[in-house]
Amino acid sequence: SRPIYENALTGIDASCFPDYNIVTGRNVNATTLTGKGTAIAVLDSGVDYRHPDFRNVDGSTRILAYWDQSLPFASFNKENTNINSSNSDNLHYISTTNSQNNYIAADNRTNTRRNNVSKHSSTIDNPYNLGVIFSEEDLNRLLMPKSSSVPSDSSTFSVTDPVTELLSPSEDVSGHGTHVAGICSGNGRASNGNSQGVAPESSLIVVKLKNETASVYTDYANLMMAVDFAVRFANSRSLPLSINISYGSNDGSHTGSSLLELFMEQVSLYGKNVICAATGNEGLTRRHASLNTISNQNTYDKSIDFTIAPGERSLYLEIWQTFADDFFYELFAPSGLESFVFPAVPGIYAYMIADTTIYLTINNPTPYQPFRQYFLSFSSNTTFITSGTWTLHIESTPTGKIVDGRLQFWLPSKEATNSATGFLVPSSDMTFTIPSTASSV
């Protein structure tokens, strides 16, 4: 079996848990705290549901629900037959006859079904119109096809039919979600009990997040739906829930006032749950810069320089300021010969300089946040964005005034862009990624 812990035990050895045994992965003075009767939701890159650490002694799954957002949305009628055939060629199937030692290798065949019909019998509703939700029963059919009991409402489905192929979750390609789930909840079956997670007897709820890689805009909606699903599912089972979110973005003001952060605050009050989110690794990545001017001064003249590395296809620059401040902005291309001035009126504007298309969105304060936002989306008119040092010139306006004087600038997190992209004079302050900046997380 693939190892899911790797070198994580070194960090555990230096953790704040007293008397923590790095060999067994357990607190020697709290052996009764095993997570039994609770659930852990892993919102990440998916989980290898076949791994022994996520299975019971009898081989059945410990995963109560697995929502794979990356799969095409599949609608099922009462006979559990896929009626959304337009997406069928992109679905991932696994043969019920290819099991070996209860550890089924992935089968990427997509066109071996007969009559373009797949069988799926999830008992979990999918009101999100996104991906496929697999129930505990669905996963057990994949893991133990010859011994699975068939629900009475699925009498037309034969798990031993040699031509039947079951829809299955897609692979956890990066392995990150599997690694995280092992640290949280692995029961140690793959290592004969030598390496266990923190809560080895907890149940699991898994969401493989859909990643909109083609868009420069951060898709927080999929994450919000994932949290909503996990909390509602756990509450329906009366299970205390711990939600782990190994996800973070620089897209936002980092003040707890975004829709995502406010959503996290509200959902934390629903049922019995606690939300844990990764804070990111942005401190030394040069993706944040700040200016702090003197309030009520008459003149102000500064520049922010940032480098776009060769090979960037798209990225964004985000600027946040207090609404009461009046600033004049002008963006210069690396040549210094092309530039454009930001309009004073909110709206969406398009510019083309240095063979690069830049969409500028200006948003005024909303009922839930008091800041003005400038969002610049860079994309290439050829192959890549023009590389080099871009300069944002900032001045006070002749008729305006500076009340607060603080300006914050963000580029995408390091995972989204080339490591050489960044501000020339960065700031390591306020570099926690969203949603770890929410007050209830």
Identify what each model region corresponds to.
Residues 1-441:
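Loop-rich non-cytosolic ectodomains and luminal regions
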